[in-house]
Amino acid sequence: MAGRSGDSDEDLLKAVRLIKFLYQSNPPPNPEGTRQARRNRRRRWRERQRQIHSISERILSTYLGRSAEPVPLQLPPLERLTLDCNEDCGTSGTQGVGSPQILVESPTVLESGTKE
C-alpha cells in the first residue's frame, strides 16, 4: 500500500481478514419454513449484521488509529441558505455546487394567511 510502512500494512490486512471472517460467519438465512419463521430469521440476521458492522468499525478505527465518523461540516444557519437560479440555470448538472448563495435578508416564505 502506497505511503505506508510494512508493519501497518500487516496490521491492516489482519484487520481486513478478521472483518471478512466475521461477515462469513453470518450467512444469509435459510428461505424455508413459514412466513413468520422466515421473517424472524431475517430479523435476527439483520441484527447480527448490524452488530458485525459496528464491531468492524471499531476494529478499523483501532488499526487505523482514527475515528470512523467523518468530521462534521460547519454550515451556515438554514435561514440564510437559498437556491438562486437567476444565472445559467440548467446548463450543467454540477454548476454552483459547493457554493451556497447566502442572502443578507431572508425573504418571507409564508404570509399571515391573506391572499394577494
UniProtKB/Swiss-Prot annotation:
Main localization (coarse): host cell
Q: Among the record's GO biological process terms, what is one? A: viral process
UniProt-listed Gene3D superfamilies: 6.10.140.630
Q: Which UniProt keywords apply?
A: AIDS, Host cytoplasm, Host nucleus, Host-virus interaction, Methylation, mRNA transport, Phosphoprotein, RNA-binding, Transport
Instruction: Point to the regions of Basic residues compositional bias.
Output: 36-47
Motif (Nuclear localization signal and RNA-binding (RRE)) on chain: 34-50
This protein's GO cellular component annotations are: host cell cytoplasm; host cell nucleolus
The subunit structure is: Homomultimer; when bound to the RRE. Multimeric assembly is essential for activity and may involve XPO1. Binds to human KPNB1, XPO1, TNPO1, RANBP5 and IPO7. Interacts with the viral Integrase. Interacts with human KHDRBS1. Interacts with human NAP1; this interaction decreases Rev multimerization and stimulates its activity. Interacts with human DEAD-box helicases DDX3 and DDX24; these interactions may serve for viral RNA export to the cytoplasm and packaging, respectively.
Give the domain section of the comments.
The RNA-binding motif binds to the RRE, a 240 bp stem-and-loop structure present in incompletely spliced viral pre-mRNAs. This region also contains the NLS which mediates nuclear localization via KPNB1 binding and, when the N-terminal sequence is present, nucleolar targeting. These overlapping functions prevent Rev bound to RRE from undesirable return to the nucleus. When Rev binds the RRE, the NLS becomes masked while the NES remains accessible. The leucine-rich NES mediates binding to human XPO1.
Q: What else is known?
A: The infectious clone pNL4-3 is a chimeric provirus that consists of DNA from HIV isolates NY5 (5' half) and BRU (3' half).
Described by its record, this protein's role is as follows: Escorts unspliced or incompletely spliced viral pre-mRNAs (late transcripts) out of the nucleus of infected cells. These pre-mRNAs carry a recognition sequence called Rev responsive element (RRE) located in the env gene, that is not present in fully spliced viral mRNAs (early transcripts). This function is essential since most viral proteins are translated from unspliced or partially spliced pre-mRNAs which cannot exit the nucleus by the pathway used by fully processed cellular mRNAs. Rev itself is translated from a fully spliced mRNA that readily exits the nucleus.
Name of the protein described by the UniProt record: Protein Rev
State the organism of origin.
Answer: Human immunodeficiency virus type 1 group M subtype B (isolate BRU/LAI)
